[in-house]
């Protein structure tokens, strides 16, 4: 190196070392050259009344929802923090598992002290149930761990006591459960059995000498597993067990067992272990339970369906074991109802964040020296998010309808509720997971950051696809129910009534070969194609099962061999039911901007559902040209929904504090001053 070059290098290094001002303070660098955050509200107008749309979407108890939002925002228990000039409340997912569990319980105590759970088990009627569902949904928007822990206590333990039990159980347990004097959990799932509840291996016998039941875990696969609340906090559990009376297995029954005393010590003849760290929901203390000759009073059998007398005689008004098991399972529908609705609120959080971010974040320019383009002005970005937004809208109406038929249920509607809740739970939770993944990718690297929520929510909600029924199993249950209804009506030569199959009493709809834009957006065309798909798949499914049975296969094995048709049919039934709920909501609206926008949303839901379903081509409902027409119309609808994007997510009614920093001033939230 020459002397001159060495001197120059030394001079540069000296300037670096001695420089006292950061580069940004250099007056020659204009601040205007830096990116500035511009709130979407400055450039995006609302083309309809967002408050009216919110009332439609939430469906019920808007005032109660806003009340509990306020309760959470005013307490430091909910991890208030300032980012980018705004206050946010969201869990600290960086805490240890033990810390997350304890703060979750403290948050529940806070909600209890402020009257949130008043009447949840002791008040009856549709209004009381809808209020409870609304408050639980807001808990889930804040933190899925809070809603799951509350849900296990009230909807699983509490509802089991309420619906499986009788007056003696109600008087002893319901008020104490509502006040958290008793903390309940629900021991159904075992290491070896989940969806197949009838196969569980826990065994209960009766001792007439002491008038006690004796519960045992006979093998390791019979240990109760994933029992929310069992690892730390629960004092009591509902035990699902095979009931053996005088050497005869009477099937699965439910019992109340104490597992901890009021000091938190584990009771004798009980062993409990922790399930450990999970991919999400670490605020819920999932545990494993073994029973070693645990004795409980005879009165602890939940006896609404069956009972055992003091001298050991088994008594039930329902003689058929299958019907008796069905009666036990019917009250558990509430779990699928709450899961379906909470999945949609999770999707709303993800879309609110991703769409708001895409309305302020820019990337690349399309003209030389031109301004960078907003992410949501790229057709590809619209294609990623706006169809999911439309689906979320349609599924909001579906979830509301499911809640309404659930709270107004009668013995005559139990079958329909089981079928609809199974389909909705599967399709809505799958939709949520797909939506969160797309939102995570749509916000780029910011989606990996925990405080921005969209990435974290994937782990928090992933479990929904398998608990309260594996989604694929639920789809097959839907198809089996439709099969049974179809065969029954044909055998009796009766018209179809119930399960939404009434359209099959009319002639088969004929679809036009040429699909124009107006045809594709016509509600009658959309209804026809959804009905045709369901009708044809049901006929194909029953025909295939019948052919297999004709070759000597059992009905159950025939169902297994026809699984592809069964899953296609389950999806077709559910998507048609969802379409009907948004059509019903739209029909009730007066002419105006809300109705117009909802019409666009409905068409987007219908057409994107058709575009994404390979069965339309597989079974020949649409030609390749038709599929191209649908695809082009979806792209047109993306452009028409784009101006409404901000208003559509604002209509979700989720307070800013429950979203994340990248939904707002992401520049200020990441500034050096915030470090």
UniProtKB/Swiss-Prot annotation:
Protein name: Acyl-coenzyme A oxidase 3, peroxisomal
E.C. number(s) listed in UniProt: 1.3.3.6
GO biological process, one term: medium-chain fatty acid metabolic process
Transit peptide, residue positions per record: 1-34
Annotated catalysed reactions: a 2,3-saturated acyl-CoA + O2 = a (2E)-enoyl-CoA + H2O2
Superkingdom of the source species: Eukaryota
Keyword vocabulary terms for this entry: FAD, Fatty acid metabolism, Flavoprotein, Lipid metabolism, Oxidoreductase, Peroxisome, Transit peptide
Induction remarks: Not induced by dehydration or abscisic acid (ABA).
Cited PANTHER family: ACYL-COENZYME A OXIDASE-LIKE PROTEIN, ELECTRON TRANSPORT OXIDOREDUCTASE
Protein family (similarity comment): Belongs to the acyl-CoA oxidase family.
InterPro entries: ACOX_C_alpha1, Acyl-CoA_Oxase/DH_mid-dom, Acyl-CoA_Oxase/DH_mid-dom_sf, Acyl-CoA_oxidase, Acyl-CoA_oxidase_C, AcylCo_DH-like_C, AcylCoA_DH/oxidase_NM_dom_sf
């Amino acid at each position: 190196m020459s002397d001159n070059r060495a001197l120059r290098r030394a001079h540069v290094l000296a300037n670096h070392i001695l420089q006292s001002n950061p580069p940004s303070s250099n007056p020659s660098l204009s601040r205007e050259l830096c990116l500035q955050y511009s709130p979407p509200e400055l450039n995006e107008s609302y083309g309809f009344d967002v408050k009216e749309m919110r009332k439609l979407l939430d469906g019920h108890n808007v005032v109660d929802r806003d009340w509990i939002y306020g309760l959470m925002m005013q307490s430091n228990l909910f991890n208030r923090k300032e980012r980018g000039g705004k206050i946010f409340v969201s869990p600290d997912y960086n805490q240890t598992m033990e810390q997350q569990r304890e703060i979750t319980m403290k948050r529940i105590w806070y909600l209890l002290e402020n009257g949130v759970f008043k009447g949840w088990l002791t008040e009856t009627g549709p209004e009381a149930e809808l209020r409870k569902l609304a408050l639980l949904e807001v808990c889930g928007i804040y933190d899925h761990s809070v809603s799951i822990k509350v849900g296990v206590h009230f909807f699983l333990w509490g509802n089991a006591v309420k619906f499986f039990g009788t007056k003696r159980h109600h008087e002893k347990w319901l008020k104490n459960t509502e006040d958290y004097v008793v903390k309940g959990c629900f021991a159904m799932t075992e290491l070896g059995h989940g969806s197949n509840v009838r196969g569980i291996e826990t065994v209960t016998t009766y001792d007439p000498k002491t008038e006690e039941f004796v519960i045992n875990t006979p093998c390791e696969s019979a240990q109760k597993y994933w029992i929310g609340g069992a690892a730390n906090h629960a004092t009591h559990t509902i035990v699902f067990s095979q009931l053996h009376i005088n050497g005869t297995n009477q099937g699965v029954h439910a019992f109340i067992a104490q597992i901890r005393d009021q000091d938190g010590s584990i009771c004798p003849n009980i062993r409990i272990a922790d399930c450990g760290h999970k991919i999400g929901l670490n605020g819920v203390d999932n545990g494993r339970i073994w029973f070693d000759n645990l004795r409980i009073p005879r009165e602890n059998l939940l006896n609404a369906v069956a009972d055992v007398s003091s001298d050991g005689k088994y008594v039930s008004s329902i003689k058929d074991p299958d019907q008796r098991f069905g009666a036990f399972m019917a009250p558990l529908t509430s779990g699928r109802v709450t899961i379906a609705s909470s999945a949609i609120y999770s999707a709303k959080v993800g879309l609110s964040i991703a769409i708001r971010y895409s309305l302020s974040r820019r990337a690349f320019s399309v003209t030389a020296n031109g301004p960078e383009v907003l992410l949501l002005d790229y057709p590809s970005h619209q294609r990623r998010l706006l169809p999911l937004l439309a689906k979320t809208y349609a599924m909001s109406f579906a979830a509301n309808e499911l809640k309404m038929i659930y709270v107004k249920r009668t013995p005559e509607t139990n079958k329909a509720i089981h079928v609809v809740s199974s389909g909705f739970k599967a399709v809505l939770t799958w939709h949520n997971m797909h939506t969160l993944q797309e939102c995570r990718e749509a916000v780029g690297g910011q989606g990996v950051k925990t405080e921005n929520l969209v990435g974290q929510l994937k782990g928090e909600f992933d479990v929904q696809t398998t608990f309260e029924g594996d989604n694929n199993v639920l789809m097959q249950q839907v198809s089996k129910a439709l099969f049974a209804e179809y065969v029954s009506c044909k055998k009796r030569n009766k018209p179809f009534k119930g399960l939404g199959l009434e359209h099959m009493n009319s002639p088969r709809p004929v679809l036009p070969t040429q699909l124009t834009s107006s045809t594709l957006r016509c509600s009658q065309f959309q209804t026809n194609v959804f009905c045709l798909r369901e009708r044809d798949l049901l006929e194909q499914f029953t025909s295939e099962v019948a052919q297999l049975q004709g070759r000597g296969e059992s009905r159950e094995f025939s169902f297994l061999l026809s699984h592809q048709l069964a899953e296609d049919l389950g999806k077709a039934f559910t998507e048609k039911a969802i379409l009907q709920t948004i059509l019903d909501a739209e029909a009730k609206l007066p002419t105006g901007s809300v109705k117009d926008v909802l019409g666009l949303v409905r068409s987007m839901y219908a057409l994107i559902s058709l575009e994404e379903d390979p069965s339309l081509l597989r079974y020949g409902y649409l030609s390749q040209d038709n599929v191209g027409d649908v695809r082009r119309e979806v792209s047109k609808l993306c452009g028409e929904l784009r101006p409404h994007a901000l208003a559509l997510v604002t209509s979700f009614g989720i307070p800013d504090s429950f979203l994340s920093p990248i939904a707002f001033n992401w520049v200020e939230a990441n500034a050096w001053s915030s470090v």
